[in-house]
């Protein structure tokens, strides 16, 4: 496994990541030739200088096309000429210390089956399968029959939620709380990005929501993909023309990690309207894995909400759906939610959903398990409440459209409370 970057407290300079130069994605700026016009226009591509960009939309054929949205609503000024897009690499790695690369030994070639059998004369290749001999007596299907299936085996086949096992519930929560700190993206990473903005990231996440709905992916897959994107951008500078490629590779990795039947690579190439080739997607997947040091089991807001729902007595499906809706709303905007841990965002989403539907407050049982009091939830709760109030006017509407479905009890149509008693 490649070595990981360890960041110190001070901000250090950027080092170029050396990759194959056939796509001219990671070339020395002094040797970089003018980029050729791609066959299909990239999603977040803009002018050569970072600044107010024209309205863009993500490209896809299967997912419904997005409305033209401004991708740079932030106040930026034209930078010096050396920051021109055509004069800088597509990816730049931010390191605080020199990385130590570890080379893996070359893999031995596998021995062919025929060669292996040649060393053992007692082993022979299987011949044609003979049909089974029919039974000479009728099978007894009564309960006393030895052929009858034990009903206890049938009962054991029911799926079990590991979070509901009391013996492990506390250990699981403690482990997730430790890992969420290790897998947390840097809060101010967008300030170090020379060519992308928070609004571009919001467009990308909104598009990934549509991709997840198109392929019926789990909500956890979406949360993981956004975590991978933020952690990748915390260490790498990316040009806007490659931002969708990063998001596509992150969604591919999250699907492989979480889904039973993940979509094929060709499917992800297809939804980008062939803006990127299969080779580019696979190379980016490899790069994301290296930057993340193969740490893919990141705790998410969705995971903590699943634990918190166990304290909901009696169970309330509308509260659960609304909490999931609020948790996904926090994915759209990097500011201010990157400064909060997933467990804290999940607590604020759970309390706000519970208060909206039932008028109840943060349960005492959750306060004991998590250590979060209503007072400690207040900063995140206030931000999430404002996001909830402004959701109908937000530029990105895929999450609201998703939760209008009866599957989620149409919770995005509920009126948020005007005030909170905290």
From Swiss-Prot:
Query: Residues where Phosphoserine occurs?
Result: 5
Single GO term (MF): protein kinase binding
Q: Does the keyword Signal apply?
A: no
Has UniProt tagged this entry with the keyword Cytoplasm? yes
Write out the ranges of the annotated region (Disordered): 1-62
In the record, biological process GO terms are: animal organ regeneration; cell cycle G1/S phase transition; cell division; cellular response to cocaine; cellular response to estradiol stimulus; cellular response to hypoxia; cellular response to insulin-like growth factor stimulus; cellular response to leptin stimulus
The principal localisation class reads nucleus
Q: Which domain of life is it from?
A: Eukaryota
Q: Which cysteines are joined by disulfide bonds?
A: none
PTM description:
Polyubiquitinated via 'Lys-11'-linked ubiquitin by the anaphase-promoting complex (APC/C), leading to its degradation by the proteasome. Deubiquitinated and stabilized by USP37 enables entry into S phase. Ubiquitinated during the G1 phase by the SCF(FBXO31) complex, leading to its proteasomal degradation.
| Tissue specificity remark | Ubiquitous. In the testis, expressed in germ cells and in the ovary, in both germline and somatic cells.
List residues modified as N-acetylmethionine: 1
Q: Name one GO cellular component term.
A: cytosol
* Cellular compartments annotated: Nucleus; Cytoplasm
Q: Which UniProt keywords apply?
A: Acetylation, Cell cycle, Cell division, Cyclin, Cytoplasm, Mitosis, Nucleus, Phosphoprotein, Ubl conjugation
Record's function text: Cyclin which controls both the G1/S and the G2/M transition phases of the cell cycle. Functions through the formation of specific serine/threonine kinase holoenzyme complexes with the cyclin-dependent protein kinases CDK1 and CDK2. The cyclin subunit confers the substrate specificity of these complexes and differentially interacts with and activates CDK1 and CDK2 throughout the cell cycle.
Record note on quaternary structure: Interacts with the CDK1 and CDK2 protein kinases to form serine/threonine kinase holoenzyme complexes. Interacts with CDK1 (hyperphosphorylated form in G1 and underphosphorylated forms in S and G2). Interacts with CDK2; the interaction increases from G1 to G2. Interacts (associated with CDK2 but not with CDK1) with SCAPER; regulates the activity of CCNA2/CDK2 by transiently maintaining CCNA2 in the cytoplasm. Forms a ternary complex with CDK2 and CDKN1B; CDKN1B inhibits the kinase activity of CDK2 through conformational rearrangements. Interacts with INCA1.
Which family does the record claim for this protein? Answer: Belongs to the cyclin family. Cyclin AB subfamily.
Quote the protein name from its UniProt record. Cyclin-A2
Q: Highest lineage ranks of the organism? A: Eukaryota, Metazoa, Chordata, Craniata, Vertebrata
Gene name, per UniProt, is Ccna2
């Amino acid at each position: 496994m490649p070595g990981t970057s360890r960041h110190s407290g001070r901000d250090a300079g950027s080092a170029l990541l050396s990759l194959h130069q056939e796509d001219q994605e990671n070339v020395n700026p002094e040797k970089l030739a003018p980029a050729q016009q791609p066959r299909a226009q990239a999603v977040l591509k803009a002018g050569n200088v970072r600044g107010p960009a024209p309205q863009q939309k993500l490209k896809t054929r299967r997912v419904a096309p997005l409305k033209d949205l401004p991708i740079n609503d932030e106040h930026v000024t034209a930078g010096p000429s050396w920051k021109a897009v055509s004069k800088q690499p597509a990816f730049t790695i931010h390191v605080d210390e020199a990385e130590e690369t570890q080379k893996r030994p070359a893999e031995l070639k596998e021995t062919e089956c025929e060669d292996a059998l040649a060393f053992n004369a007692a082993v022979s290749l299987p011949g044609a399968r003979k049909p089974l001999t029919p039974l000479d007596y009728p099978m007894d299907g009564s309960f006393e029959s030895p052929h009858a299936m034990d009903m206890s085996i049938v009962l054991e086949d029911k799926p079990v939620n590991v979070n509901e096992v009391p013996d492990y519930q506390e250990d699981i929560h403690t482990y997730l709380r430790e890992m969420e700190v290790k897998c947390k993206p840097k809060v101010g990473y967008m300030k170090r990005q020379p060519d992308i903005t928070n609004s571009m990231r919001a467009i990308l996440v909104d598009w990934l929501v549509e991709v997840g709905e198109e392929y019926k992916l789990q909500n956890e897959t979406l949360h993981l993909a956004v975590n991978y994107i933020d952690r990748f951008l915390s260490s790498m500078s990316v040009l806007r023309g490659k931002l969708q490629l990063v998001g596509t590779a992150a969604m591919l990795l999250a699907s492989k990690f979480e889904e039973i039947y993940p979509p094929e690579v060709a499917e992800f190439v297809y939804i980008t309207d062939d803006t990127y080739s299969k080779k580019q997607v696979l190379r980016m997947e490899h790069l994301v894995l290296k930057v993340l040091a193969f740490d893919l089991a990141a705790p998410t807001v969705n995971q903590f909400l699943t634990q918190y729902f166990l304290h909901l007595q009696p169970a309330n499906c509308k509260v659960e759906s609304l909490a999931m809706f609020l948790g996904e709303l926090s994915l759209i905007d990097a500011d201010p939610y990157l400064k909060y841990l997933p467990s804290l965002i999940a607590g604020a989403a759970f309390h706000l959903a519970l208060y909206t539907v039932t008028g109840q407050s943060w349960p005492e049982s959750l306060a004991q398990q998590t250590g979060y009091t209503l007072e400690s939830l207040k900063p995140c709760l206030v931000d999430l409440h404002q996001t909830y109030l402004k959701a109908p006017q937000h530029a990105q509407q895929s999450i609201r459209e998703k939760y209008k479905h009866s599957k989620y009890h149409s919770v995005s149509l509920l009126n948020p409370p005007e005030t909170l008693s905290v």
